[in-house]
Amino acid sequence: MAAVTLSVSTVKPLGERVFVKVSESEEKTAGGILLPDSAKEKPQVGEVVSAGPGKRNDDGTRAEMEVKVGDKVLYSKYAGTDIKLGGDEYVLLAEKDILAIVN
């Protein structure tokens, strides 16, 4: 079996899934205290890097995705599958786990 090298350009979500680059978490508190990695909360905001074609309806057509590449989104805290690529963090989510598009 040939080895596969994963990169952002090789990950293509299927169905109603979305591939999101996770935003950096805060390094310090509002009071200026530096936070160690163990004390940082998992970010819930990121930018859509790629999106699947949408959910297939009963009649065989596809429902259009509500998010598109480049959208900044807020998603559920424990949703998706975490993926690390090239030192950056990503999450593969179902579109239903996205709570809002952030402008």
Swiss-Prot record:
Pfam families: Cpn10 (PF00166). Its main location: cytoplasm. SMART domains: Cpn10 (SM00883). Keywords: Chaperone, Cytoplasm. CDD domains: cpn10. GO terms for molecular function: ATP binding; metal ion binding; protein folding chaperone; protein-folding chaperone binding; unfolded protein binding. One of its GO terms (cellular component) is cytoplasm. Heptamer of 7 subunits arranged in a ring. Interacts with the chaperonin GroEL. Together with the chaperonin GroEL, plays an essential role in assisting protein folding. The GroEL-GroES system forms a nano-cage that allows encapsulation of the non-native substrate proteins and provides a physical environment optimized to promote and accelerate protein folding. GroES binds to the apical surface of the GroEL ring, thereby capping the opening of the GroEL channel. PANTHER family: 10 KDA HEAT SHOCK PROTEIN, CO-CHAPERONIN GROES. This is Co-chaperonin GroES. The lineage of its organism: Bacteria, Bacillati, Cyanobacteriota, Cyanophyceae, Oscillatoriophycideae.
